[in-house]
Amino acid sequence: MQDSTSAPEITPELSAAAHKINVNKLEKAPYDHTGKHPGNKSFSYLLRLMINVGKSVIFRNFEADKIPPNNGGRISIATHINGLVDPSLMILTQKKRIISLGRHDLITGPIIGWWSRRNGAQPVLRKAEVEAGVADENFARKINDRSMLTIANCLAGGHGAVIMPEGKSHQDSKLHALRTGAARAALASAAIARKRGEPAPVIQPTGLHWERHYWFRTKSYVEYTDPIEI
């Protein structure tokens, strides 16, 4: 079995959209460090409705385990091979209001960005953008720190988060090197929750299974194991 030390460090190829940094929109993206969700609650309900309709169209058969209940926040993590379909199913199969991390252009784009901002999604400027000279390192650190602090406070406030530790969607049959975001969010949110006298969040491993992930109208199954206490 491949362990994390041998997982390949593969820099993602930047898309045309990823090459365009909208500094103004990134700075104005909603965030909150008090524990409140930065998104609009009505849009959260509307997003779930849209995902549910999309699920009925995309999948011929869909099944999901009942997610283990917990009193605090929840960090759902999974491998990432199916783009926006992966986090969508993780959002749909739980009741907690979700805050997510997304590539910067998914937050600033003209259509999906409009939805993302209203649902409180937090932008991330990746190492790939910095190394390619697309993003300034200091600006990237500022945005990423702000986003991670928002995620941590939301989790401490009892909300859920969807994080893909590989940091990108890919088609390889092996795990790519993991980013540290999920672990940092877990530790920070647990510390904040305990200081506030609230239950610490848990890490919820999630299995996303497909009969053929590249087929339209394929079968899908979302698996939930026991959560990991922090």
Predicted regions and their residues:
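Intrinsically disordered, low-structural-confidence terminal and linker regions
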Residues: 1-27
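Soluble catalytic domains of membrane acyltransferases
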Residues: 2-8, 35-230
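Generic N-terminal amphipathic, Lys/Arg-enriched alpha-helix
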Residues: 29-34
